[in-house]
Amino acid sequence: MHSYIRPYQHVALRLPSELTKIVRLVPNTVVYLGKYGSFPANTIIGRPFYLTFEIIDVSGENNDNCLRIVPPAELHAETLIADGEGEGDDVEVNEEGIPIRTNREIVDDASTQKMTAEEIEALKKVSTGAGREIIEKLLESHSALDQKTAFSLAKYTLRKRKKFLKRFTVLPVDVSLLTNYMLEGKEAMKTMELRDESIGLIGCWGNVHHGGQSSFEGAVASKPNGRYLVIDETGGLVVAAMAERMGILYPHDQEDEDQELAEGSEENGERQQTNAMAQALARRRHMAASGNSITVIHANKQPSLSLLRYFGYDQDNPDESHPLYKHMKTVSWMQLLDPHADTIYANEPEVIPDETLATFKSNRRSAYYKKRSRWERVRRVVDEARAGNFDGLIVATLMEPASVLKHTVPLLAGSAPVVVYSPTVEPLTELADLYSTPRRTAYITRKREIIAQHSLQQSLQGQSQDNEKKPQEPDFSELDKDFALDPSLLLAPTIETSRVRAWQVLPGRTHPLMSGRGGAEGYIFHAIRVFPSHQNIQAAGNPSRKKRKVAAQQESATPAESGSGVDVEMQS
């Protein structure tokens, strides 16, 4: 993540009302913040994050310098007011013990404020002090201000600051901020009401981490290599969270990209000089990472990953300098289950010699290179996905989990974690039942019975001794009727949930805040991929301790001789 604001970058603006607005900073444009005013985007481009600005209205000018950086001392003074606990509110009592000054007799209605709404609106138009003049006028015209305690006065002042101060704080857009932004807005269903706590559980149980920069051949011995299989229907939020953990979410600095491209051009220099195809594909290859990659399975022609645009990656027009350009791969369900039914995978473009290509026009030659490179990319990604050996499976979909795991779990390597997210617990309880121990035992027992019956039939028919005929495999179609999926492929299925709630802690009134958001809880199913053994394994239980036996039972010792230090021989 960059430490300063860059052009064409999405940033989050924290307003005084504690609301967050995400905007894209386009140079030479104006950013509008509603009632808080507007400012030119060029005034904050190039500045560091986490600065608080005040919008100063400058009439008669081009508003080139209409922002003021709020110093930390001023911010800290306001924070002390907001977090104060009423220091200096020691209530004086009279001789009878009755408080002299409280808020009980104060009636907070519109009559205490002498300024009308029309006067406040007129003052907004002529005010140039970022709202401070309006706050001062409101405090002066309040008739019951002297009756307030110090703490109630601080709360009143803070409430007016949130309403009239024209301030904003620039924050970088990360996964946690975007999750809360989508959850608190009106688009929570687009992300399946995924919360920050659930994202943490997904990354933890999925063992999502950076897979290293080594090549695929060099990293085979040091598994895992960071290849993850993902089904994401949250608009790309799960993919963004995984990419953040893997270090491939945020674009790198241009200096690092130039150095990387220079090194790549030196390594491929000879190949570019000898092959015309390599010259056309000299630019950065799309979906070419062999490790530390995310393979997204989608049901449509293109995956729905619209939320990745907040991190500088547009699925329709991807930037070659972005890490996701190489490290994120997309495969459709048709390409995964029946690749020859896909027109792009099945129809290979004709290979045209370089001599013939030299006679083509530039636009025709470019179209041929694009078509050929697209077929090679689809072929490579699909074959790699069907080969399997992934290091983890992350599922966040509204489809039936059993139908998804039936085709994706066999693609995982041994000890690979499986994580399934669902807003409700019912689909996950059914999934946990399908992988439960009783079902696994029944599946293995039934499978052994089928194998035993098949062996008996072969021995009776004499096929086992016939070398000319190939032995037939047992028919496991009956297992598919009784079991929706193979329960012996996953071990230790578990369902978990986690949710952070803000509580009101007061004597006798401790409960969750009534203003807290409801919605789905969000549940996580996780298990471990295992390979079932093809041998009959029987548990023998814990062996009992060996019993000591005297070697020569004929020479039994008397009670007096038993403590004479005679060695006792152990027999196994």
Curated annotation (Swiss-Prot):
One cellular-component annotation, GO: nucleus
Compartments (UniProt record): Nucleus
Region entry Disordered, spans: 456-479, 538-572
Comp. bias (Low complexity): 456-465
Keyword RNA-binding: yes
Biased composition (Basic and acidic residues): 466-479
Biological process, per Gene Ontology: tRNA methylation
GO molecular function terms noted in the UniProt entry: RNA binding
Alphabetically ordered keywords of this record: Nucleus, RNA-binding, tRNA processing
Family, similarity comment: Belongs to the TRM6/GCD10 family.
Role: Substrate-binding subunit of tRNA (adenine-N(1)-)-methyltransferase, which catalyzes the formation of N(1)-methyladenine at position 58 (m1A58) in initiator methionyl-tRNA.
Subunit structure: Heterotetramer; composed of two copies of TRM6 and two copies of TRM61.
Name assigned to this protein: tRNA (adenine(58)-N(1))-methyltransferase non-catalytic subunit trm6
Gene name as annotated: trm6
